[in-house]
Amino acid sequence: MNSDDIRTVVFEILRRIAPESDPSALDPNENIRQALDIDSFDALNFFVRVNEQFGISVPESDYGGLNTVSEIVGYLSARLG
């Protein structure tokens, strides 16, 4: 899975978490929690869905460093190899 495929899946997950938003319009370096008004419960749901969709387990200790689309896609690209 390449970075574009990962980004597409991340956008789909974000659309489910924040259905009134358009994640694809985000600046890749913009904080998604602030831009999409995602609270801590929604953020947790996002990572649960990421784990399910990609078949990996993102440790909770990594959540705080994954705030932008670029950070999330880079992290997942590295984890998925």
Model-derived regions: residue spans:
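Phosphopantetheine-dependent thiolation modules in NRPS/PKS and related acyl-activating systems
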Residues: 2-38, 52-53, 57-81
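Conserved alpha-helical interface elements of two-component signaling phosphotransfer modules
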Residues: 41
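Acidic, metal-associated active-site segment
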Residues: 44-51
